[in-house]
Curated annotation (Swiss-Prot):
Family annotation (InterPro entries): Epimerase_deHydtase (IPR001509), NAD(P)-bd_dom_sf (IPR036291), NAD(P)-dependent_oxidoreduct (IPR051783)
The name this protein goes by in its record: 2'-dehydrokanamycin reductase
Pathway annotation: Antibiotic biosynthesis; kanamycin biosynthesis
Underlying gene: kanK
Recorded catalytic activity of this chain's protein: 2'-dehydrokanamycin A + NADPH + H(+) = kanamycin A + NADP(+)
Domain of life: Bacteria
Keywords, in A-Z order: Antibiotic biosynthesis, NADP, Oxidoreductase
Gene Ontology terms, MF aspect: aldehyde dehydrogenase (NAD+) activity; oxidoreductase activity, acting on the CH-OH group of donors, NAD or NADP as acceptor
Family statement: Belongs to the NAD(P)-dependent epimerase/dehydratase family.
EC number: 1.1.1.355
GO CC, alphabetical: cytoplasm
Role of this protein: Mediates the conversion of 2'-dehydrokanamycin A into kanamycin A.
GO annotation, biological process: kanamycin biosynthetic process
Length: 352
């Protein structure tokens, strides 16, 4: 059920008269994952010949005509052998998690004309000022962000020594039907259980920070256009939503769609980060506005138009609730206790 639902979305327009010389043989590593599903759909719709490489692929997620192969990139030279066997015109790598991965990708794809390495906006660290540009360089806080920055540094070194002109794409958070939706206080879907139960929504700093969610179909459409642009080489480009949504509005939309009252309770983000056992997501990402300068994306992918929006995010949230995919109950209980703990602190002797 979820496999089929995950493929639904706005129709991706295909150019049925696409010249043969514009058709590429594209290898997508990680093509069956959260982002990869949208990428593969878009490439297939654009009439490219797509091969998906993954460690544990899900054939049901792949459009008809897309071929799947196995890749365990930790095996010595496995990636290099796969590229040599498939002879792709282009590679989109969604599985570069650290510097070692990036080095393997660049070595394996040394003879490939077009290479796209997907990084993350977390590589830029907390977005204390917005819009965030490609030149923003605040130190990342999380291990994930630090590793993604190392990916970028490895690719930049290859630019500098002339061994690669891979395109670096700094991707924001991506959602789709069938994938989970994080809340503001934790990288987890427990906020959905609170909404379904009609419990108060616990937000940080009134939920005023704007969250940035890009639909996987939109991510795929943009990456497909970037891949087709011969000028999109040797640069770093942001790919994120043009319609960031305040956390408060996101929570309110879901509560109202469920017919539940919306009674938000706010706690200070800095204080909450000190209380939670795992506060990396709040400290690095969700307490800050996720607003990105997409000017370079506009220049490199001028025909790309984002189709997702708040209504589609709400649709995904409702689907997750119906499926019972509502996060970690213990974590949810910890978050629900925060307002009472804050009240106790504020009324303690000697505190105002």
């Amino acid at each position: 059920m979820s496999s089929q639902l995950a493929l639904r979305g706005p129709e991706l327009s295909a150019n049925l008269c696409k010249p043969e010389e514009d058709t590429l043989r594209v290898l997508v590593t990680g093509g069956s994952g959260n982002v990869g599903v949208g990428v593969v759909r878009a490439l297939n719709a654009a009439r490219h010949h797509v091969v998906v490489a993954s460690r544990g692929y899900s054939p049901a997620l792949l459009p008809e005509g897309v071929r799947a192969v196995r890749l365990e990139r930790t095996e010595p030279d496995a990636y290099t052998r796969l590229v040599a066997a498939e002879k792709p015109d282009a590679v989109i790598d969604l599985t570069c998690h650290d510097a070692a991965d990036a080095a393997v990708t660049l070595r394996a794809c040394a003879g490939v004309d077009r290479v796209v390495v997907v990084s993350s906006v977390t590589a830029a660290g907390p977005a204390t000022t917005t819009p965030v540009t490609e030149a923003t360089a605040a130190p990342p806080l999380s291990e994930y962000g630090i590793d993604k920055l190392a990916v970028e540094e490895t690719v930049r070194a290859a630019w500098a020594d002339g061994t690669s002109q891979a395109l670096l794409v700094r991707l924001g958070a991506v959602y789709r039907l069938g994938a989970d939706l994080d809340g503001q206080l934790a990288e987890d879907g427990c906020w959905l259980a609170h909404a379904a139960a009609g419990a108060p929504a616990v937000l940080a700093d009134d939920g005023a920070a704007r969250w940035n969610l890009l639909h996987a179909d939109d991510a795929g459409a943009a990456l497909a256009e970037l891949l087709a642009n011969d000028r999109a080489r040797g640069v770093l480009v942001h790919l994120a939503s043009r319609h960031p949504l305040p956390w408060r509005e996101l929570y309110e939309r879901v509560h109202h769609a469920l017919g539940r009252p919306f009674n938000p309770v706010s706690v200070p983000a800095e204080w909450a980060a000190e209380q939670l056992e795992d506060a990396e997501f709040l400290a690095e990402t969700s307490r800050w506005d996720q607003v990105f300068d997409l000017g370079l994306l506009d220049r490199l992918a001028p025909s790309y138009q984002e189709r997702g929006g708040p209504s589609r995010v709400t649709e995904v949230a409702l689907w997750l609730i119906r499926q019972g995919r509502v996060g970690d109950a213990e974590l949810g209980a910890e978050i629900q206790e925060l307002p009472a703990r804050l009240a106790a602190v504020r009324t303690a002797p000697g505190l105002v």
